[in-house]
């Protein structure tokens, strides 16, 4: 107990000056720790940038969770068992990427050339053919890919069934307008189409009761080998984690620069 009393007395007599007097190096570093004075203009420049970077990083994290949910929902829809395509267009439009079946007769003379595209390094087109169901409704079917040299239908007549058919594939919704500004305009007069525009395709083919969705046929082989189905691209780009890391890194870098700038100013004084 006597030792504890002596220790308390020693600590009571101790002060910052005596501590640093025994350690000159600490005296030199004291201004760096206690003399930090944020300056107005550097702060007005740095703080908004840090807040912006942190906000954008947080937004990318939210986008990451959204994209992961979208990917999971798509995979779940694709892996589910096929169902008959609903006759209610509104119901069917809520089933994008679900596997569906449809029955009807192909209107081969009204097929649409969707391109230019490529498969395995070969340039060509995707063939969208109207399918007339027993109800009279028209559903466009993306039957798959053909090489450019088979654009003439006479070179692939074997792959054009004339009677009732059953098709299975993924229900798809067309884009709302041009997917991006890099695509050329569709040319219905030349049967050159660069994105799916079902209302315009219906007008070009003089068709009525066209469904507001289409079907990507699966990879079941067609007679003659063409078209080759199964062209749906299911993968989604998901770079949000990298983007978030970039924004957070920029925020940290700006904080470091801000602190070092003020430390330099303190040292110079």
Residue ranges and their predicted role:
Residues 6, 25:
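Localized chelating/binding microdomains
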């Amino acid at each position: 107990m006597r030792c504890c009393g002596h220790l308390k007395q020693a600590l009571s007599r101790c002060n910052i000056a005596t501590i640093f007097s025994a350690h000159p190096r600490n005296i030199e570093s004291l201004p760096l720790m206690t003399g930090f004075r944020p300056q107005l203009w550097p702060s007005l420049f740095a703080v908004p940038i840090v807040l912006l970077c942190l906000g954008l990083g947080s937004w990318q994290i939210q986008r990451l969770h959204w994209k992961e949910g979208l990917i999971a929902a798509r995979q779940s829809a694709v892996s589910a068992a096929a169902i008959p395509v609903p006759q209610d267009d509104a119901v069917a439009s809520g089933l994008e990427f679900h596997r569906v079946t449809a029955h009807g007769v192909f209107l081969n003379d009204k097929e649409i050339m969707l391109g230019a595209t490529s498969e395995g390094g070969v340039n060509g087109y995707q063939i969208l053919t109207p399918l007339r169901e027993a109800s009279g409704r028209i559903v466009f079917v993306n039957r798959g890919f053909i090489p450019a040299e088979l654009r003439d239908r006479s070179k692939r007549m074997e792959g054009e069934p004339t009677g009732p058919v059953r098709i299975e594939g993924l229900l798809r919704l067309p884009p709302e307008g041009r997917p991006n500004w890099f695509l050329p305009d569709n040319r219905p007069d030349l049967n050159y189409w660069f994105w799916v525009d079902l209302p315009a395709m219906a007008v070009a083919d003089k068709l009525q009761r066209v469904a507001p969705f289409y079907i990507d046929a699966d990879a079941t082989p067609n007679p003659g080998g063409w078209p080759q189905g199964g062209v749906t691209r299911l993968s989604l780009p998901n770079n949000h984690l990298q983007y978030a890391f970039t924004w957070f890194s920029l925020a940290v870098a700006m904080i470091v620069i801000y602190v070092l700038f003020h430390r330099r100013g303190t040292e110079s004084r």
